Amino acid sequence: MENGFLLINKEQGKTSFETLFPIKKYFNTNRVGHAGTLDKFASGILVCLVGKYTKLSGYFTSLDKEYVAEFRFGLETDTLDPNGRIVSKTDYIPNVEDIDLKLKDFVGEIYQSPPRFSSVHIDGSRAYKLALNGKFFEIKKRKVTVYNIQRLSYDFSSSLLSLKISCSKGTYIRSIARDLAYSLNSCAYVSNLKRTKVGMFRLKDSTLCENLSKASLISLESLKSFEKVYIDSNKINLVKNGVYFEIEININEFKILKSREEKILAVIQGVGLNKYKYVIIF
């Protein structure tokens, strides 16, 4: 079975889950997943995991993201995207000076409420399922980090604002559109969204599903943030059997265990000071 990860350029109109179908078919395995869901209306880089690499989903999901987003002022939909039902309208369209001033409030550590149509869990149910059934519920605000917002363009006549946003995991761009508009006494939704970066990986390095090849599969060697630890031959069987021995590691740090012959043996993750768990054993 193949093991590795892929940088897929997800197309608009497909869910992240649907994007996995051709990957499963190509590699002839159901052991395929993705890290960091992209909404159906969105496009851009989606990290997909094959084989044992599916166990690294948590790592890839935790990486920072970059998006290019388009907000349309004057309308709000229930989903805060183009596919939703219009729930609010206004004739007031903010000017660019006010937008630039308010954007500063959305940089740094901020608290935001995820959209009602999202995969957030509410008492054991997904928020979007409750919303579809017309249920009343509240979503608690969450702390996220927005590292930078750059205005790319603003067309007052069409009410379209284009932004580049760098942010931490868990940041909802749809919530930024909603909250920015509210702060300007207007309303808005995200009319277009493209993810351009996940961690160190860029959209330009991704591939469309129809262009898949075995060469598209990326190994752990490309993860420069994973330190390599070389294991002596007398300890290789210990690694293969998941036996613990002394390795210096910090909490949440990932390390690759390799033989002196450069063969990857395992991936470990720190769960405390010099304490770790095996994530993958090859």
From Swiss-Prot:
SUPFAM superfamilies membership: Pseudouridine synthase
Family indicated by similarity: Belongs to the pseudouridine synthase TruB family. Type 1 subfamily.
Active site: D39
Protein name: tRNA pseudouridine synthase B
Record Pfam families: TruB_N
Organism: Borreliella burgdorferi (strain ATCC 35210 / DSM 4680 / CIP 102532 / B31) (Borrelia burgdorferi)
Gene that this polypeptide is encoded by: truB
Record field: catalytic activity: uridine(55) in tRNA = pseudouridine(55) in tRNA
InterPro entries: PsdUridine_synth_cat_dom_sf (IPR020103), PsdUridine_synth_N (IPR002501), tRNA_psdUridine_synth_TruB (IPR014780)
Presence of the UniProt keyword tRNA processing in the record: yes
Described purpose of this protein according to its UniProt entry: Responsible for synthesis of pseudouridine from uracil-55 in the psi GC loop of transfer RNAs.
Entry keywords, A to Z: Isomerase, tRNA processing
GO molecular function: RNA binding; tRNA pseudouridine(55) synthase activity
Listed GO biological process terms: mRNA pseudouridine synthesis; tRNA pseudouridine synthesis
Catalytic EC class: isomerase
Entry EC number(s): 5.4.99.25
